[in-house]
């Protein structure tokens, strides 16, 4: 009777707690120095081949930009980031790929939670390449949180805005704490989140609500970029 009871309890544990028996791979770890760029064609789902493997030294050798970014979060607050690295389009060119041939960009990260191909984020190429995005240095003190995925720039929020390129940051620092966001500076950058996508916010209108959540697209721990090309 006792043996049957123990066997039953063990069966319940296996059914209800598979992670105890078959643990999943741990994610959210530093990605490493090498960036793997793979390419595939539209309509060939999941079929990607390695085009280039770029070392940290190769990425450092590309023209560098140090930029500041402000992005709205999913809870309607503002995240501030400072990052240094090459422009994303330069990284793609360094891999021997014509920017004009790229339809979709997929970021592979160790923070992907086990998704297919470790994709954290995928987007149309023209969203961050060739588009105009902005940094708003005065938005922290002039921003109204309206709810989840909703906020509004107040008077003065758009003053001093500047266009920023999308970069693949080798070193960066970000914060969602308003008091820290106002004091953010380049000396705070480190490589803990590398490689990280840093992109600006879309064009905002003073006094007009926006639901453009861009902070969750600031992927970190990127170890690979998959590019879906036009054609076949």
Where are these regions (language model features)?
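Positively charged n-region of N-terminal signal peptides that target proteins for export
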Residues: 1-4
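Hydrophobic core
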Residues: 10-18
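Juxtamembrane cytosolic interface motif at the C-terminal end of transmembrane helices
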Residues: 19-23
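N-terminal intrinsically disordered, low-complexity segments enriched in P/E/S/T
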Residues: 24-232
């Amino acid at each position: 009777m006792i043996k049957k009871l123990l066997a039953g309890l063990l069966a319940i544990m296996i059914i209800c707690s598979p992670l105890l028996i078959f643990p999943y791979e741990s994610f959210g770890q530093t990605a490493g120095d090498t960036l793997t760029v793979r390419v595939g064609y539209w309509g060939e789902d999941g079929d990607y081949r390695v085009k280039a493997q770029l070392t940290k030294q190769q990425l450092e050798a590309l023209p560098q930009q140090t930029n500041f970014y402000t992005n709205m979060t999913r809870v309607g607050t503002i995240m501030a980031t400072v990052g240094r690295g090459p422009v994303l389009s330069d990284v793609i060119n360094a891999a021997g790929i014509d920017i004009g041939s790229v339809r979709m960009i997929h970021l592979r990260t160790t923070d992907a939670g086990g998704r297919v191909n470790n994709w954290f984020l995928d987007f149309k190429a023209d969203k961050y390449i060739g588009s105009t995005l902005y940094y708003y240095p005065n938005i922290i003190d002039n921003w109204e949180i309206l709810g989840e995925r909703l906020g509004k720039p107040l008077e003065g929020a758009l003053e001093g805005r500047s266009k920023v390129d999308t970069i693949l940051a080798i070193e960066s620092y970000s914060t969602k704490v308003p008091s820290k966001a106002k004091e953010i500076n380049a000396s705070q950058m480190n490589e803990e989140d590398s490689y990280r996508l840093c992109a600006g916010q879309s064009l905002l209108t003073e006094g007009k609500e926006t639901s453009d959540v861009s902070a969750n697209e600031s992927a970190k721990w990127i170890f690979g970029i998959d590019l879906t090309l036009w054609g076949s």
